[in-house]
Amino acid sequence: MDIKQQRAIDRYVGVPLCWLLSGVNRIISNEPDGVPPKKILVILLSEMGSLVLAHPMFVRLKQQYPEASIHVLMFAKNREVLDLMNVIPPENIITLDDSGFKSLVKDSLKAIFTMRKLKIDAAIDCELFARISSIFSYLSGATFRVGFHRHTQEGLYRGTFINRAVTYNPYRHLTQQFLSLAAALESDTTPANKLLPEPYTGKTPVLEFPVEELLQTTRDLHNFFPPIKEKKLVLIYPSGGILPIRAWPLKYYCQLAKTLLDEGYAVGVIGLKGDRAVAQQVVDFCKDPACVNLAGYTKSVRHLLAV
C-alpha cells in the first residue's frame, strides 16, 4: 500500500476503532497492578530510521527490567534493520505485511493472537501519529499502555485508553522522546514523565562486517563502475522516499554532487529502483563518469551499508 492508502485506512478505520475501544476500556478497565512488567512489547511500525533512534530506549528497558523479555511489533519490510542492530532476539519479533489491505488484516489478526498468547504486560507505542499502533497496544492485552497523547494540544485522536500517556514535544530529539516512553512505565504524573529523561551515555552501535564481505562488495562495485575505482566515494539520496518533503530541492543535490566531484570525490546516487529517474537527473547534470546511478543497485540494507 502507498502512503495515501495507509493514511485513509488509519483515519476511516482507525478513528471508529479508537472510539469503540475507548468505550470498552471505560467499562472494562484493566489498570496496572504495580508489578514490574515481565513481557514488554515495543510497537515501531513504519519508520526504518526510528528503529535506529530507538536503540537507546531498548538498552534502557533492558537496564530497567533485566528479567523482562522484550518483543517488537513492526512492518516486515523494516525487519532487516532491527536484525542488523542485534538488540532483540529474532524469535521475539512480530511482523506485519503492509503490501496490501488483505495481507495487513491477515497479519494483524495473527499478531493479536500471538500477543495475547504471550500475555504481554506492557506495550510501548512509539508511533507519533498513527492510530493503528495505539489499537494494537490495547488489543495486545497489556495493562501498561504507554504512548504519545495530545492531551490539551492539537493532534490526532488516538483514543483514551493509553494509561501512561506522554506528551509529544517537537523540541526534543526523537531519541529523548523514546527514552521518555521507557521512563513513563514507572511514572505517576499526568501527563506521564513530564521531565527530561536521564541522558543516554552508552555507546553508539557499530555494525561490523567480515573483511572478505567488504572486499567482495568493493570488487563488485568497481567492476560495475570502473571510473570510481581510485576515488573516495560519497553517497547521496535525493529522493526523500514516501515523504518527498524531507528532501532538498533536486537542484541542491545536483550542486552538491558537482562540488564533491570538483574536489576529487566519486559520487554515488542511491535509492530504490523507483528512484532511478530522479538519480539519473543528478548524473545527467554532473556529466562526470565518477558520478554514478546506484538507485536499485544494492540488494539490501546490509549491502548498502557495506558499499
How does the language model describe each region?
Residues M1-V307:
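Catalytic machinery of carbohydrate-active enzymes
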